[in-house]
């Protein structure tokens, strides 16, 4: 990678963020597409967010990515939001269009792109969890024409989750069904009629636990996805594969949300296959 007076910067802004794999992905992409850009990680305090966003214009950057805790806090500093960012209420990518800062959320698009030969349009989905990743998957599914969504959260989280789903219905006219994870018979019934089952919780990161009981029976054609990629195969995915179901981890979502952002910044397609190779070697 050559750096010179014309190199344009991009960065991921979060706290903590030093561990991020994003610089690895994007700098590979800049190199592979012969784009004069560089991608770094900025770990900042909340009090520096406004100044950091102002620097996108000041230094004529391509833009930035955002992770926790700044995906929502950044919104007041932007000129415009994309449809999905408005629906989700969170931004993970800011694009500098001639000094106009536009907020996007590429997480949901990235998630659906990583599913092998699967389109959500007209399909039924069961989603476990209602945090940031779940919201982006939810909103994107609605924009892409999903026919039914059942969201399962622990009963203690029901009240916290409902206002967001009500807001989604208000904005899109789409009603999402909200259920308690503890009702196993309801979970079984919803999964039995689903085309896609997604774990969007952090359960399984320990390599031990699974978000659903093992006695749940999966329909044959159900695709199972987990947003976790460390461990590479969670107990949830192992269990799905043991029933003969196709199962996908979260590494593809990470790569394809980055590819979406890269295209928004540069107008170029990220060479995802090449980078996927390096990523799987790194994490498998």
UniProtKB/Swiss-Prot annotation:
Assigned EC number: 1.1.1.25
Active-site residues per Swiss-Prot or TrEMBL entry: 71 (proton acceptor)
Keywords from the named record: Amino-acid biosynthesis, Aromatic amino acid biosynthesis, NADP, Oxidoreductase
Coiled-coil blocks: none
UniProt-listed CDD domains: NAD_bind_Shikimate_DH
Reactions listed under catalytic activity: shikimate + NADP(+) = 3-dehydroshikimate + NADPH + H(+)
Enzyme superclass (EC): oxidoreductase
Classification via SUPFAM superfamilies: Aminoacid dehydrogenase-like, N-terminal domain (SSF53223), NAD(P)-binding Rossmann-fold domains (SSF51735)
Residues at which NADP(+) binds: 83, 129-133, 227, 250
Protein residues bound to shikimate: 20-22, 67, 92, 107, 229
A molecular function GO annotation: NADP binding
Any one Gene Ontology BP term: shikimate metabolic process
InterPro entries the record matches: Aminoacid_DH-like_N_sf (IPR046346), NAD(P)-bd_dom_sf (IPR036291), SDH_C (IPR041121), Shikimate_DH (IPR011342), Shikimate_DH-bd_N (IPR013708), Shikimate_DH_fam (IPR022893)
Matches recorded under Pfam families: SDH_C, Shikimate_dh_N
Pathway as given in its UniProt record: Metabolic intermediate biosynthesis; chorismate biosynthesis; chorismate from D-erythrose 4-phosphate and phosphoenolpyruvate: step 4/7
Signal peptide start-end: none
Subunit structure, interactors included: Homodimer.
PANTHER family in the record: BIFUNCTIONAL 3-DEHYDROQUINATE DEHYDRATASE_SHIKIMATE DEHYDROGENASE, CHLOROPLASTIC, SHIKIMATE DEHYDROGENASE
Protein task: Involved in the biosynthesis of the chorismate, which leads to the biosynthesis of aromatic amino acids. Catalyzes the reversible NADPH linked reduction of 3-dehydroshikimate (DHSA) to yield shikimate (SA).
Family: Belongs to the shikimate dehydrogenase family.
Designated name of the protein: Shikimate dehydrogenase (NADP(+))
Source organism per UniProt: Streptococcus pneumoniae (strain Taiwan19F-14)
Lineage start: Bacteria, Bacillati, Bacillota, Bacilli, Lactobacillales
């Amino acid at each position: 990678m050559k750096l010179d007076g014309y190199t344009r910067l991009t960065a991921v802004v979060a706290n903590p963020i030093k561990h991020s794999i994003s610089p690895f992905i994007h700098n590979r992409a800049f190199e592979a597409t012969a784009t004069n850009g560089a991608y770094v990680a900025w770990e900042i305090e909340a009090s520096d967010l406004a100044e950091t966003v102002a620097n996108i214009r000041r230094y004529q950057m391509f833009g930035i990515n955002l992770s926790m805790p700044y995906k929502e806090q950044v919104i007041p500093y932007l000129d415009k939001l994309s449809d999905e960012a408005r629906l989700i209420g969170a931004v993970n990518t800011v694009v500098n269009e001639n000094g106009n800062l536009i907020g996007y959320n590429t997480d949901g698009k990235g998630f659906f792109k990583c599913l092998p030969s699967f389109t959500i349009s007209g399909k039924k989905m069961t989603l476990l969890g209602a945090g940031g990743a779940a919201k982006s998957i939810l909103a994107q599914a609605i924009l892409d024409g999903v026919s039914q969504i059942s969201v399962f959260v622990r009963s203690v989280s029901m009240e916290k989750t409902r206002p967001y789903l009500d807001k989604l219905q208000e904005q899109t006219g789409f009603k999402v069904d909200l259920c308690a994870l503890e009702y196993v018979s309801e979970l079984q019934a919803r999964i039995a009629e689903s085309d896609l089952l997604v774990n969007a919780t952090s359960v399984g990161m320990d390599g031990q636990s699974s978000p659903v009981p093992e006695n749940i029976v999966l329909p044959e054609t159900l695709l199972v996805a987990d947003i976790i990629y460390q461990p590479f195969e969670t107990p949830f995915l192992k269990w799905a594969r043991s029933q003969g179901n196709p199962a996908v981890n979260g590494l593809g979502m990470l790569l394809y949300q980055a590819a979406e952002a890269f295209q928004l910044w540069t107008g170029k397609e990220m060479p995802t296959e090449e980078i996927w190779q390096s990523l799987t070697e790194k994490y498998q």
